[in-house]
Amino acid sequence: MVNISDFFGKNKKSVRSSTSRPTRQVGSSKPEVIDLDTESDQESTNKTPKKMPVSNVIDVSETPEGEKKLPLPAKRKASSPTVKPASSKKTKPSSKSSDSASNITAQDVLDKIPSLDLSNVHVKENAKFDFKSANSNADPDEIVSEIGSFPEGKPNCLLGLTIVFTGVLPTLERGASEALAKRYGARVTKSISSKTSVVVLGDEAGPKKLEKIKQLKIKAIDEEGFKQLIAGMPAEGGDGEAAEKARRKLEEQHNIATKEAELLVKKEEERSKKLAATRVSGGHLERDNVVREEDKLWTVKYAPTNLQQVCGNKGSVMKLKNWLANWENSKKNSFKHAGKDGSGVFRAAMLYGPPGIGKTTAAHLVAQELGYDILEQNASDVRSKTLLNAGVKNALDNMSVVGYFKHNEEAQNLNGKHFVIIMDEVDGMSGGDRGGVGQLAQFCRKTSTPLILICNERNLPKMRPFDRVCLDIQFRRPDANSIKSRLMTIAIREKFKLDPNVIDRLIQTTRGDIRQVINLLSTISTTTKTINHENINEISKAWEKNIALKPFDIAHKMLDGQIYSDIGSRNFTLNDKIALYFDDFDFTPLMIQENYLSTRPSVLKPGQSHLEAVAEAANCISLGDIVEKKIRSSEQLWSLLPLHAVLSSVYPASKVAGHMAGRINFTAWLGQNSKSAKYYRLLQEIHYHTRLGTSTDKIGLRLDYLPTFRKRLLDPFLKQGADAISSVIEVMDDYYLTKEDWDSIMEFFVGPDVTTAIIKKIPATVKSGFTRKYNSMTHPVAIYRTGSTIGGGGVGTSTSTPDFEDVVDADDNPVPADDEETQDSSTDLKKDKLIKQKAKPTKRKTATSKPGGSKKRKTKA
């Protein structure tokens, strides 16, 4: 049976004095058998020449417990002073062996590593913080390939050290270097502070970090120094104060996990005894108790049973609890008093965040702790307005029958007669006229029962009806530290070995999805009883959670020069780049086209200028546009999408990839396309009105007539003022132009001919006089198309369409309108543009006037 103590506590302390790791490290500059043999030949002058190769073989195949069997004297003799002058690279591991035996500290090892001269470090010019690279995660294959060239250190040799990586290392990517440091127990941070032990500097380091290093006088080393640090550090971080503190923390985590596992065992034993007694007495068994404990899913078996067991999001859970605890008091105040946290005005709460982080579990536990009965509905099953009215509406002002059979003297049953409605997966509901989103938002405004809504995407357009209606409570992905103790408890309970240092990789692989992590452990435990650094890469690759990136993330990733370097191209292949395009193949080409001019290229060919690279990228984008026209044409050549991915996104980005000069901008093409459609519609309307007095098409009207109209309709106001009103109206009547057409014509001009500033120079009295006189006169009207002057809005003129993101269900039949919502389908003449109604009199009506008099006058008008 394996035990977690192999990774924590006493057993780890005994490994500190082992000597097998150091002897293996002697030849670890290149981890090959030849190096080991060569090193053993070098040490053949010592008293025990044949024991060292044997210890190396044992160390490769045995567990850390086997390391204790190696004798200390052989280790001391191998590090005799006569060996040190031989060669610098070969003697360092030998000195490391003696250091490990003499209980050195981490500071002793750091003092032996030469510090970098900060004046010779190349600083990134015009540096801006790169959020994406700072949060980038290394690929498992990348870590395996790059870590293989590093010397292998002792278990937890960097324990107690806080390391910061900055800049570009010569042979190691940022993610791989951080994973290597975490593998040996180091704490890796992004920023430098007084708690930082050492900084590993590379090329193009941040200037602010260099200033911080000088200010705090922190040790700075390069990649070679990082190798020496791993090779020279003793097991368990040595005897320093920081290492001892880290060991105590690991031991405390081990004790907590052990206690929680023991409590789980006791609860299972008590539960099995109760079930056995119930079966003997012939009592009723609940559905959950029928399934044996060993047959349950781990996500159910190890689900939190109280709020203290919820991993992360403590603030969000307490906010939800306070809202629900004060709900009845807020109801008595008619939800008019916000309270201290501002939640007293909301009848409903909206929990939103990524899947698998405990939103539904938190809602259930909060309701149970406060004594509420729970009515849960899956909103994605109750998608339409009809089903929502049938299934949920009647429960909004009802009571729980279960509460009448509970003992009211118990604290948890104080709210037993009340229940809370939990609507899960709200973002899966249908929008539009027949969808349930709008109806559910109405429920949130008038419900007499606490309503908890749960969704993943709060910012979807169809979720806007819930704005200012629900109390928004955001749940975030928990970090590895908040999940670690729970996972270690599960590992102890299920009797398999889980290295605490690989939990970060598990969380990274699943992107903080606790549910997926537990399912991962459940599946792996059937085939192996150990999860450590030897198999974590294979596990991470198999269980990697694929999430479609958003357009901003895709553009930043594609325009990053690192993925086009020699190392980056091996780890992030062409297929991976094309896969980025397919995350959003509608927006990716537009985002690349918008931002490809905002980079500082780092992948230029020798002798190639930035302008030449931009020209090649622009030419390729134009070719991609030709391919897209074929794809979107009537031929529907969707098989050309991979070619379009290369021409429109991958190839242009590869030419100009590097560092972003600013932030990623959203594509302006959408706005410009909408603007062009608007002006095309206005031009078509003006052409339709003026065609009785002109003989040209729309293009000719824009190029030839509109500049003349500008001179005849605008310039007279600047020269003559109010005296030009009559002449301007006369010109408009000659060409059948309306007042709206006058405004539209003035919007068409761009560049030096823009009219915005000129119109502001016209006095306000002239503008108002022009409007009043035009409205007081009758004007010739061109022939209008049928229905073009009357806007829609009646029941007979519009059809209700569901939200474009959802498919209409078979049960989504049209809902008959209520009596009070019935509208007259007859044509409303008040909305006709050509029929004008007299303004209502401003004088106050006398009390003796008949109510029908005004109606008669309105009818005659």
UniProtKB/Swiss-Prot annotation:
ATP binds at residues 299, 311, 353-361, 456. The modification Phosphothreonine is found at residues 38, 63. Residues 803-823 have a biased composition (Acidic residues). Its main location: nucleus. SUPFAM superfamilies: BRCT domain, P-loop containing nucleoside triphosphate hydrolases, post-AAA+ oligomerization domain-like. InterPro entries: AAA+_ATPase, ATPase_AAA_core, BRCT_dom, BRCT_dom_sf, DNA_pol3_clamp-load_cplx_C, DNA_replication_fac_RFC1_C, P-loop_NTPase, RFC1. Changing residue 436 to R: In cs mutant CDC44-3/4; causes cell cycle arrest. Residues 16-28 have a biased composition (Polar residues). The modification Phosphoserine is found at residue 40. Keywords: ATP-binding, Cell cycle, Cell division, DNA replication, DNA-binding, Nucleotide-binding, Nucleus, Phosphoprotein. Residues 836-861 have a biased composition (Basic residues). It is found in: Nucleus. Residues 1-103, 788-861 are annotated as: Disordered. GO terms for biological process: cell division; DNA repair; DNA-templated DNA replication; leading strand elongation; mismatch repair; mitotic cell cycle. GO terms for cellular component: DNA replication factor C complex; nucleus. A motif (Nuclear localization signal) lies at residues 830-834, 855-860. GO terms for molecular function: ATP binding; ATP hydrolysis activity; DNA binding; DNA clamp loader activity. It comes from the Eukaryota. Component of the ATP-dependent clamp loader RFC complex for the POL30/PCNA homotrimer DNA clamp. During a clamp loading circle, the RFC:clamp complex binds to DNA and the recognition of the double-stranded/single-stranded junction stimulates ATP hydrolysis by RFC. The complex presumably provides bipartite ATP sites in which one subunit supplies a catalytic site for hydrolysis of ATP bound to the neighboring subunit. Dissociation of RFC from the clamp leaves the clamp encircling DNA. Present with 2360 molecules/cell in log phase SD medium. Belongs to the activator 1 large subunit family. This is Replication factor C subunit 1. It comes from Saccharomyces cerevisiae (strain ATCC 204508 / S288c).
